[in-house]
Structures are given as C-alpha cells and as structure tokens.
C-alpha cells in the first residue's frame, strides 16, 4: 500500500519487526502515522508524552485537516445518523481538531495510529496471539521505542496513554491490562467484548448454541446487530454464515473470524480453533475455556487483581452507549460490576454510558453521537493531562512540552 503524503504535522514510519518476522518466517512490518505537536521544530529541547490511538488500519492520519471544508464538495447523506451533508461535517470537525491541536493552551503531545495488518485482518488487536504472533510485544517493545526516539518522546510508562473505539477500545483496555507498567491510562470507547459472558448476545461459557436461544420448544435466533431503538438488523447466524462464504479458515476478513484468530488457540489443522461450529452454532467448551483464561479482560482482572490492581489504579476508563449497535454495552455492565467492587485498591477509574447512544459513543454527554465520534482527541487529551498531573513521578518532565 502506497502511504499517503507526509505533511508539516503528519509523518510516517515503518519498521521490520524482528519478533513478527521470526514468528511468520518472512519479513513482517509495522507502520504508524505520527501527528506531531505544534512547535515541534521550534522546541528541540521538548520531550513529549505519547498517545496511541488504536483502531482499524489507518490509510493516513484521518480526522486532521488544516483547511476549512471544501466549498465545492457535494453533500452526501448519512443513513446511520440521519444527517444531510455528513461528509462536510466530517471535514468541518477535522478542521476543528487542527484548530484545537495548534491552539496556545493545548498540551503538546505526540499521537500515533498504528498499522498492524496481518494475514487474518486489518488489525491484530495489539496483543500476543497463538495465531497472529507477538503483536503486543512487537508494538510495545519495538515500534513504540523507535517512534519515541525518532520524535523526542519521554519514553517512560507514566507518559504513554491509550485510547480508541470499538476494536480500538478493546485494544486500549487490553493493552493496558497486559502491559500495566508500560502505559499510564486507557480510555476505551464502545470496546469489543470485554467479558465473554456477553460476547455480543452469547455467553460462551454457559450457552450451548451461539445461533439460537437455549429454549426447549422453538428456535429463537440470537441477534447480532440492532439500531438505537432496538430494531434487529441481522442475526449472529447470518453474520457467521456470511463470513463462511467470504473465506475459509478464518480468512474472510470479518469480525467473527478475527476474534477467533486473536482469542483462540491454534487448531489441529494449523488454523484458529473455532469457538463454535460455524454451520450449526454449537459452542466448543474447551475453546471457550481457553478464551476465558487468556483474553476475557474482566475475568483476568478479577483473577489477578491482587497483582494488577495496584498497577492499574486510576488507569481504566470505559465508555459505551446503552444501545450499542452490537450489544457491546452488556459486557461493560459486567465489567463495571467487578470494578466498582474492587478493593485493595479500588480501581478509581471511570465508566459512563450514553442514553440511547449507539456504537462509537465516547463519553460525551453534551453532543449527539454523530459529532462526539469525531472528537475523540478533544475528549481524551484533557483527561490525559489531568492523569499526568496526578500521577507523574517525582522529577518527571512535566514542563518541557507545556509551551
């Protein structure tokens, strides 16, 4: 893929990962788009905090525009948000982010969007996996140090932060949990399932069949997608069967397939082991147990709170709409139940819900989801600054980047 052009503010880096190349037996690469702060060249003495904005494969650093919206753009219509001219709105808010980013009172930080496409998906979920390889270690210990050195970042755990939505929301929380000392806070919006008792509409530990409710007299299909008034858009069976048509052995490029590739063990055929029979929906309890022990974030926090708790105090922030399109709010409720009852220490973070808000809601109680989803950076940068002010260790550089 030919990368987009660099600009004054946006740079591109690409490295060959030794860890991933060894795992795959051929050269494997990681890339990142880097958004530099205002005044980067004029302040060579400054060292910056680093923000990792996780999400799907970034063709470029989207949502950042140095000019007002194109006056000649033909307006489109967003069916999802019932919004005329949403393409113009997107450009408007990209320009507003540029104005915010360059304003005198905005804290100067570096933001990156990581490219970690792999043979199964456009994204690795930024953790180590039997099927995908050590993407978590490669990003945390190879790519990020390279970027920090190249772009004068502080390069310490207290000065690294994570945020993202949907896939990026799971990654933000998952990376914080698996690398608790390497990052100082995560802001996870509408995360993919963080408790597999609410794996969208399935409890993979107790349910027998993923496609139908466990009822003795009839087959009631489990939903997979809905709108914000609860109308079902498609079923889980339909979603999984579509992926079977698109590709074999978890190679459809679809959502269910990548979850199995990341969360599951290697199967007997060398491909990811299915969590359930894709034709019938019958759940494999052995695969489910592997998922629980290795990637069920709520379960892992409960199991390991004695060691993880002190390292994660104040670092976990989760946001979701209570009408998430893919039922992802249900797992957040279960996570909240755990975290609000933690002791020694209390988790001391934040969980918030958007009333009747759908997918991608990020904690903004003052704007509709159509707009708040375009303001992730403005939502979380002030929270990151507050976290630094509260938690930076004695002697830490909290001033060179405040110009």
Predicted feature locations:
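Non-catalytic cap/lid and distal C-terminal segments of serine-dependent acyl enzymes
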Residues: 1-403
């Amino acid at each position: 893929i030919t990368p987009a052009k660099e600009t004054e503010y946006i740079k591109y880096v690409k490295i060959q990962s030794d860890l991933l190349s060894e795992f795959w037996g051929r050269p494997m690469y990681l890339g990142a788009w880097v958004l530099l702060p205002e005044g980067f060249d004029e302040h060579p003495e400054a060292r910056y905090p680093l923000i990792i904005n996780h999400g799907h494969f970034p063709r470029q650093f989207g949502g950042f525009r140095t000019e007002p919206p194109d006056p000649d753009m033909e307006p489109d219509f967003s069916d999802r948000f019932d919004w005329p001219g949403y393409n113009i709105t997107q450009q408007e808010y990209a320009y507003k982010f540029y104005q915010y980013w360059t304003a005198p009172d905005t804290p100067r930080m570096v933001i990156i969007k990581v490219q970690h496409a792999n043979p199964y998906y456009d994204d690795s979920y930024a953790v180590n996996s039997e099927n995908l390889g050590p993407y978590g270690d490669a990003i945390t210990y190879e790519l990020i140090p390279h970027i920090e050195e190249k772009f004068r970042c502080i390069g310490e755990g207290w000065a690294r932060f994570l945020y993202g939505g949907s896939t990026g929301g799971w990654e933000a929380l998952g990376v914080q949990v698996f690398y608790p000392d390497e990052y100082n806070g995560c802001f996870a919006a509408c995360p993919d399932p963080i408790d597999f008792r609410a794996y969208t509409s399935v409890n993979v530990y107790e349910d027998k069949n993923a496609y139908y409710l466990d009822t003795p007299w009839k087959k009631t299909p489990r939903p997979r997608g809905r709108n914000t008034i609860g109308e079902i858009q498609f079923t889980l069976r339909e979603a999984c069967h579509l992926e079977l048509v698109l590709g074999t052995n978890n190679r459809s490029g679809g959502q269910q397939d990548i979850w199995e590739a990341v969360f599951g063990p290697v199967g007997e055929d060398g491909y990811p082991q299915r969590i359930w029979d894709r034709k019938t929906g019958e759940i494999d309890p052995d695969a489910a147990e592997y998922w629980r022990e290795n990637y069920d974030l709520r379960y892992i926090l409960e199991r390991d709170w004695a060691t993880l708790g002190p390292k994660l105090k104040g670092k976990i922030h989760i946001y979701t709409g209570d009408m998430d399109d893919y039922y992802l709010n249900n797992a957040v409720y279960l996570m909240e139940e755990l975290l609000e009852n933690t002791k020694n220490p209390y988790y001391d973070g934040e969980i918030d819900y958007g009333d009747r808000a759908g997918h991608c809601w990020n904690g903004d109680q003052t704007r509709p989801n159509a707009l708040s989803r375009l303001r992730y950076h403005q939502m979380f940068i002030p929270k990151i600054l507050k976290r630094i002010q509260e938690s930076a260790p004695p002697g830490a550089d909290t001033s060179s980047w405040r110009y």
